[in-house]
């Protein structure tokens, strides 16, 4: 019995060394993990833990080959193997997380500067929207109850549309029809024929002021919302209300439509963002990460994601599940009224105090912060950014402001990373991409 027991020990050691050698030879030159191993890693890593234990056992084996193998596994090319077979309780430390976050290098973006100031409205400029087809003109709505259409290149007024009797809060232009829709505090949503420059339809149904409107990109419907805290869907042709989506507890500030689920996204003063399932007629997801009034949200023009802003808080979200992507470096930015994103991953957040904050969308890094230019004769209290949008190319930024002006901003053409390094990249553990 004793002889048999002693004879089995060398066999077990040999098996252990053989298994270890196989694993090291398999992965010592690997730069990534096979999908099957990654799944094991995500499912408690039972097989991999066994291997990790074998590595530890081999350290105690008093023979030449096993000692050489242990030394071999400390080579740089094999560090991936040891990292894979960590025990589940070996979590990354806060300092390691911080250093990892700092190691990300944000994309460099050229700085922005004021290019043009346009005057014409006699009240706050509450909304702005660019022609999505030809990118040749843009429309603005104001507290003076009018909608004005401007030439984008020259900044000249083309026409003034009159029809609302109270402040115009939002504008949406259809890509599929020659129509523009406007939402107003007078409880009406109007459809404007851009070929005849007249209002051709009114949509009645909201119980109080309408704050936002958007056109569905593939269906003949529009979504509206406002002070009555419900989202309403309308048939464009018949003007009939086809669905009401209740759920928010406070006035809704912005609604956006998508061609795929979730087809409706809304944000509200109740500090929530809701993703709506219009087939079921209810919210499929409620995002509660913000703590204050969410004043605006916008879709990324190329990615399937969106961003939202509230006081001292800018966040981006992945669609369709609504997963939090990034906390932006937005501390001490104050009340934020508007957010816009271009194709180059530049995010603008416009503040109630007239601050324009420019961020790298991928990392949340604030690379430029500047104050808007005061218009002669305006009060300091009127220096607020109320709305914004990039043009179709993303090279021009248009802002509507509390001093009744419209401003067009462009990037500095000859800027380089050496001449404008931007604000320092000093992320915190709060500001990171998840």
Swiss-Prot record:
Mind listing the GO biological process terms from this record?
Answer: mRNA splicing, via spliceosome
UniProt main location, coarse: cytoplasm
Extract the Pfam families matched here: WD40
**UniProt keyword Ribosomal protein, yes or no:** no
Looking up Gene3D superfamilies in the UniProt record yields: YVTN repeat-like/Quinoprotein amine dehydrogenase
**Top-level taxon of the source organism:** Eukaryota
State the GO CC annotations.
Answer: catalytic step 2 spliceosome; cytoplasm; precatalytic spliceosome; Prp19 complex
| Record-linked InterPro entries | G-protein_beta_WD-40_rep, Prp46/PLRG1-like, WD40/YVTN_repeat-like_dom_sf, WD40_repeat_CS, WD40_repeat_dom_sf, WD40_rpt
UniProt WD repeat ranges: 120-160, 163-202, 205-244, 247-288, 290-329, 331-369, 380-419
Which CDD domains does the annotation name?
A: WD40
| Subcellular location per the Swiss-Prot or TrEMBL entry | Cytoplasm; Nucleus
Q: Which UniProt keywords apply?
A: Cytoplasm, mRNA processing, mRNA splicing, Nucleus, Repeat, Spliceosome, WD repeat
Segments spanning the bilayer are: none
**Function of this protein?**
Involved in pre-mRNA splicing and required for cell cycle progression at G2/M.
Quaternary data: Associated with the spliceosome.
Tell me which family the UniProt entry assigns to this protein. Belongs to the WD repeat PRL1/PRL2 family.
How is this protein named in the record?
Pre-mRNA-splicing factor PRP46
Highest classification ranks of the organism? Eukaryota, Fungi, Dikarya, Ascomycota, Saccharomycotina
Q: Which gene encodes it?
A: PRP46
């Amino acid at each position: 019995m004793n002889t048999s027991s002693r004879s089995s020990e060398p066999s077990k050691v040999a098996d252990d060394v053989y298994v270890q050698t196989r694993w090291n030879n398999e992965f010592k030159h690997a730069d990534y993990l096979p999908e099957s191993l990654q799944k094991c890693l995500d499912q408690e890593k039972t097989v991999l833990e066994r291997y990790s234990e074998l590595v530890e056992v081999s350290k105690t084996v008093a023979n030449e080959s096993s000692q050489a193998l242990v030394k071999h596994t400390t080579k740089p090319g094999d560090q991936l193997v040891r990292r894979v077979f960590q025990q589940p309780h070996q979590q990354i430390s806060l300092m390691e997380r911080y250093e990892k976050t700092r190691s990300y290098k944000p994309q460099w973006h050229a700085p922005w500067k004021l290019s043009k100031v346009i005057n014409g409205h006699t009240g706050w400029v509450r909304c702005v929207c660019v022609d999505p087809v030809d990118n040749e003109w843009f429309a603005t709505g104001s507290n003076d109850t009018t909608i004005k259409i401007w030439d984008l290149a020259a900044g000249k007024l083309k026409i003034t549309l009159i029809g609302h009797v109270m402040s115009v809060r939002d504008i949406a232009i259809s890509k599929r029809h020659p129509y523009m829709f406007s939402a107003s505090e007078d409880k009406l949503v109007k459809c404007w024929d851009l070929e005849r420059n007249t209002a051709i339809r009114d949509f009645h149904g909201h119980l109080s002021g309408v704050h936002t409107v958007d056109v569905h990109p593939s269906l003949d419907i529009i979504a509206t919302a406002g002070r009555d805290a419900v989202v309403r869907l309308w048939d464009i042709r018949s003007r009939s209300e086809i669905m009401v989506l209740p759920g928010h507890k406070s006035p809704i500030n912005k609604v956006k439509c998508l061609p795929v689920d979730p087809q409706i996204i809304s944000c509200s003063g109740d500090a929530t963002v809701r993703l709506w399932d219009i087939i079921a007629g209810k919210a499929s997801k409620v995002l509660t990460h913000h703590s204050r009034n969410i004043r605006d949200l916008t879709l990324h023009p190329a990615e399937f994601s969106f961003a939202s802003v509230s006081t001292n808080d800018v966040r981006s979200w992945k669609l369709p599940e609504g997963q939090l992507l990034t906390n932006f470096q937005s501390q001490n930015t104050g009340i934020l009224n508007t957010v816009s994103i271009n194709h180059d991953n530049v995010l603008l957040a416009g503040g109630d105090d007239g601050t324009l904050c420019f961020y790298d969308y991928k990392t949340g890094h604030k690379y430029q912060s500047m104050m808007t230019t005061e218009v002669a004769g305006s009060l300091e209290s009127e220096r607020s950014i109320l709305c914004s949008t990039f043009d179709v190319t993303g090279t021009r930024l248009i802002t509507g402001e509390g001093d009744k002006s419209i401003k067009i901003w462009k990037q500095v053409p000859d800027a380089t990373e050496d001449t404008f390094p931007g604000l320092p990249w000093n992320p915190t553990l709060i500001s990171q991409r998840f």
